[in-house]
Structures are given as structure tokens and as C-alpha cells.
């Protein structure tokens, strides 16, 4: 019977970017937060160890989704089979509901969902739970290797893509280096979220090139950026440990405030109580907003600064073009949705209402069948 797995979206609660490194990559510091919003990935697999046959077939309801080895779900399944020395005939179908290349980590989440589905289809998930399992067990004779231990799964996920490992944790997650070094943080309690998807494309490689030019213009060296990211990591750790970082409410360097003012009260969110939303920001906004002014305006509408329904936090997610706002109540979120109904600077925006997802809920809700 096919296995259906929810493939949840993520947003970034702040994203610090370092100067370009010698290897061409950039060090990052961010907090990922998973959402209820999801694709559905269906996996069908048959063990073909005896026949020594292996095949992967991928389909989707969205023609923009690659149906070959370029797809992260395909890569994840192929790497898992190779690493375990296993053989299987695998079919993957991605029911695409999340934006493609929108900054929500959809492709990376698809990869983890495909791995979870593959494990269940071939019975690897049951074997991994067996405390008596060893590398010399009979399962090893069937090509099922040691990679199913959590640390190995994270290594394989990182080999597929920078954002992939976070989806093996879920909830609220600290991401370091290129984003592939991940650590679970205490979950924020669920809050309402509006995801705004504009009909505007943002090229991530181009955004990084613009960032590199900005670093050069401002004289940000590799050493200075390393210090910047270390300080940001410590600040995140303090905030999620219940300490309030120093620094007051201010507009981000992109010029658009990320939250709407003093929301203190007996039912305040931990996002406000820790003070984290008063200082975190997404560095990509500094280079993306000047190129796409409509995105800055969408963030302004989501934040609704100075109003009773102001967001707890609003930001670009990843390099965009998707933006999001977090809200204390459903009513506040619905008002934000209403503000997105008309085109913004000539750009149509699709607004979606969802909620943030704790780690427990993430795993409890993942497998549908």
C-alpha cells in the first residue's frame, strides 16, 4: 500500500548571512520554523534485492516540478538506496500545494518526506526501532545499512541540500553554516501565520551576488562576518533559553519594521516575551527589496505596525519571494489576509492562512497512511 507523507513548509525567523567564503558558499545563521502548510508526497516501493534491480519514477501535479535526478526527492531516495546497498523499484508522486522556489523549503521538505515514505515502504523504520539491531544483523544481508541511525540520516540530508536536514527535526530549529548544521530549539507555542506568495520571482543566486556586492561596498570581511554570525547565534540561544537579548524595537536595516509595537499582555506569545522579534531580521531583505519594491510593501502590510492587529513578526522567507506574518489571534491573521486581496504595486498576491507547528505535532501529523 502506498505511503502518503505530509511535506511541511518552513519560514525563517531571521537570517544572517556572512561574507562570501573561499569555497563560494556563505555561512548562515537562522532559526527555521515549520508550518502546518504542506505538500503531500506519496511513495510506493518494492524491495528488489533478489533481482538486483533499481528504478525511480517521479510524477507531480505541477509541471514545474523536475521529474528526474534534479529533483531533491529523487536525489534523496537514490542516495539512500546507494548508501544502504539496497535495491528497490520506487515511485514518487508529489502533490504540489506549496510555491515552487518560493523560500518555504518545499523541495527540501519533499526530500525528507520521500525518505520517510521509502523507509516505511521497505520496513526500514521498524528495523531502526529494534534495540537489538547491529550491523551484523540479517537485515544487513538484505542491503539495509547503518545510515538509518539519526546522525547518518542528517549527513545524507545535508548531502542532498542545505535546507534538507531541518526537516528531519521539525518545530523550531537553529540552522548554522550553510543551513545544514541544525540543532533543535525549544518550540514556540503555535501562532497564526499568513503566507503571502506574490507573482514575482526572486533568483537566489542573484540575491547572493547582490549581497556579495553589498559586503564589498561596506567592507565586511570574512573575519567580521564570522564574528557577526557568532554573536547572532549566541543571541538566538539566549532568547530561546528565556533570556531577553539587549536592544530595543527598531526598524530592520531594510527599512521596514518587522513587528508592530508593544504587544505585551498576559497571553503574549513567547515570540514577544523573549524579545526576539524586536531585533532579528532577514539580511536578504537589504538586497531583494531594492530590486522588488512590491515585496517591501507586502511586508509593510503584513506587519501593520502601530495598529491593534499588528503582526508579532513579519519577514521575507529565505531569499523570497514568499513573505509571512505571525499573529497572536486568528482575527488578526484574517485582517492581514484581507489587506492582500488587491494587487500591490501591480503585483497579485496569494495569501494563505496557516499555523506554526511544534516538533511533536510535526511528527505526529507527518504520515497520512
Residue map of PLM features:
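ATP-binding N-lobe of GHMP and related small-molecule kinases
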Residues: 1-102, 106, 119-128, 133, ...
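Solvent-exposed alpha-helices and their adjacent loops that cap or buttress functional pockets
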Residues: 34, 158-159, 165-168, 184-189, ...
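Short, basic/glycine-rich phosphate-binding loops at helix/coil junctions
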Residues: 50-66, 114, 156-158, 272-282
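DPxDG-like acidic metal-binding loop motif
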Residues: 73, 102-127, 145-150, 157, ...
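Conserved, helical-rich catalytic subdomain that frames metal- and/or nucleotide-binding sites
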Residues: 169-313, 328-331, 338-341, 345-369
Amino acid at each position: 500500500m502506498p505511503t502518503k507523507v505530509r511535506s511541511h513548509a518552513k519560514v525563517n525567523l531571521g537570517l544572517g548571512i556572512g561574507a562570501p567564503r573561499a569555497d563560494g558558499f556563505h555561512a548562515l545563521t537562522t532559526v527555521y520554523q515549520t508550518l502546518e502548510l504542506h505538500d503531500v508526497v506519496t511513495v510506493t516501493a518494492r524491495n528488489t534485492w533478489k533481482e538486483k534491480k533499481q528504478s525511480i519514477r517521479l510524477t507531480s501535479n505541477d509541471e514545474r516540478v523536475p521529474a528526474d535526478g534534479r529533483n531533491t526527492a529523487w536525489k534523496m531516495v537514490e542516495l539512500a538506496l546507494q548508501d544502504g546497498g539496497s535495491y528497490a523499484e520506487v515511485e514518487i508522486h508529489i502533490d504540489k500545494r506549496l510555491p515552487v522556489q518560493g523560500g518555504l523549503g518545499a523541495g527540501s521538505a519533499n526530500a525528507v518526506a520521500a525518505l520517510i515514505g521509502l523507509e516505511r515502504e521497505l520496513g526500514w523504520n521498524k528495523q531502526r526501532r529494534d534495540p537489538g539491531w547491529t550491523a551484523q544483523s540479517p537485515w544487513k544481508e538484505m542491503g539495509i545499512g547503518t545510515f538509518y541511525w539519526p546522525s547518518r540520516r542528517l549527513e545524507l540530508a545535508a548531502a542532498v541540500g542545505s535546507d534538507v536536514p531541518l526537516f528531519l527535526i521539525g518545530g523550531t530549529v537553529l540552522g548554522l553554516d550553510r543551513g545544514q548544521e541544525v540543532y533543535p530549539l525549544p518550540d514556540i507555542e503555535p501562532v497564526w501565520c499568513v503566507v503571502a506568495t506574490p507573482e514575482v520571482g526572486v533568483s537566489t543566486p542573484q540575491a547572493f551576488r547582490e549581497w556579495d556586492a553589498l559586503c564589498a561596498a561596506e567592507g565586511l570581511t570574512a573575519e567580521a562576518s564570522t564574528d557577526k554570525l557568532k554573536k547572532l547565534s549566541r543571541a538566538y540561544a539566549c532568547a530561546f533559553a528565556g533570556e531577553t537579548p539587549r536592544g530595543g524595537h527598531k526598524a530592520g536595516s531594510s527599512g521596514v519594521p518587522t513587528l508592530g509595537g508593544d504587544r505585551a499582555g498576559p497571553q503574549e506569545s513567547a515570540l514577544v516575551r523573549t524579545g526576539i522579534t524586536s531585533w532579528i531580521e532577514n539580511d536578504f531583505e537589504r538586497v531583494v527589496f531594492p530590486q522588488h519594491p512590491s515585496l517591501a510593501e507586502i511586508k509593510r502590510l503584513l506587519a501593520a505596525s502601530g495598529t491593534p492587529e499588528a503582526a508579532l513578526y513579519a519577514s521575507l522567507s529565505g531569499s523570497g519571494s514568499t513573505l509571512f506574518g505571525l499573529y497572536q489571534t486568528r482575527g488578526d491573521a484574517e485582517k492581514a489576509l484581507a489587506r492582500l486581496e488587491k494587487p500591490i504595486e501591480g503585483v497579485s498576491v496569494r495569501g494563505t492562512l496557516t499555523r506554526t507547528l511544534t516538533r511533536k505535532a510535526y511528527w505526529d501529523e507527518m504520515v497520512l497512511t
